[in-house]
């Protein structure tokens, strides 16, 4: 899926002092990224504080951020994950209507690791796929959801129509999951879920990376991607190690 940019940046959600959504702040972040060579954004992920927001707040953010990003010609993916299939479908349809290029979702969390079986998660994603006419991406974040998908589950996801995988799981198995998501659909998108494995993901066949680090240092992340595309692994390794230091200094989220 070559239409996806190699770097997608998860935009932080901006708030006012009273806790209200600060849409202009988010627009400023998006403009900053665009001015520094970023052409794709990921909305309402972990950096976007999606578990802390009401559905109405997510709708407001999606509308404002997509309008601004699309005016700049940026590619947009919106996370619509919730514990409720109906609410996730509502968010997915809204994102599609506002011009999102794709939607994504984690598994329906809270009960994910204790009560749901893999077939329950498959049914959740199949329902979202059937509700929209844009690609649906599985956001694998086992640390947050408690569900670590087996390889067979990832292969079955593509059979439901899921178009790709953002992988923030066990990085030792990246190659295996990359192959699994493409077993049924060779064009399925595979995204490394963290800048810490940007280099490793590229080497196992990832289409790109979702990079929170690029919120602060977009030039550093785009330089790493350029080195990879030029086959300069020595320079890419140097930049990857530098990015690891930046990530430690920044902390998570």
Please tell me what each predicted stretch does.
Residues 2-148:
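Active-site beta->alpha loop and helix N-cap motifs at the rims of alpha/beta catalytic domains
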Residues 40, 250-253:
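Short amphipathic alpha-helical segments at helix boundaries and their inter-helical linkers
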Residues 127, 142-251:
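Catalytic alpha/beta core domains of metabolic enzymes, predominantly
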């Amino acid at each position: 899926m070559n239409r996806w940019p190699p770097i997608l940046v998860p935009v932080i959600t901006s708030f006012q002092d009273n806790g209200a959504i600060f849409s202009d702040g988010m627009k400023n972040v998006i403009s900053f990224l665009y001015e520094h060579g970023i052409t794709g954004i990921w909305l309402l992920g972990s950096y976007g504080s999606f578990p802390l927001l009401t559905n109405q707040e997510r709708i407001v953010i999606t509308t404002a951020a997509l309008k601004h990003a699309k005016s700049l010609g940026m590619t947009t993916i919106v996370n619509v994950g919730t514990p409720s299939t109906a609410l996730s479908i509502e968010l997915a349809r809204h994102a599609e209507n506002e011009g999102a290029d794709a939607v994504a979702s984690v598994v329906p969390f809270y009960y994910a690791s204790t009560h749901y079986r893999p077939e329950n998660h498959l049914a959740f994603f199949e329902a979202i796929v059937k509700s929209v006419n844009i690609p649906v991406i599985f956001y694998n974040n086992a640390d947050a959801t408690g569900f670590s998908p087996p390889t067979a589950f990832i292969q079955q996801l593509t059979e439901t129509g899921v178009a790709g995988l953002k992988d923030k799981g066990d990085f030792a198995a990246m190659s295996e999951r990359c192959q699994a998501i493409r077993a049924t659909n060779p064009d399925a998108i595979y995204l490394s879920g963290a800048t810490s494995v940007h280099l490793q993901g590229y080497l196992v066949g990832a289409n790109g990376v979702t990079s929170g680090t690029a919120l602060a240092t977009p030039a550093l992340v785009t330089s790493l991607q350029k080195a990879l595309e030029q086959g300069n692994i020595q320079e890419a390794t140097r930049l990857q190690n530098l990015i690891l230091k930046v990530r430690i200094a920044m902390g998570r989220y």
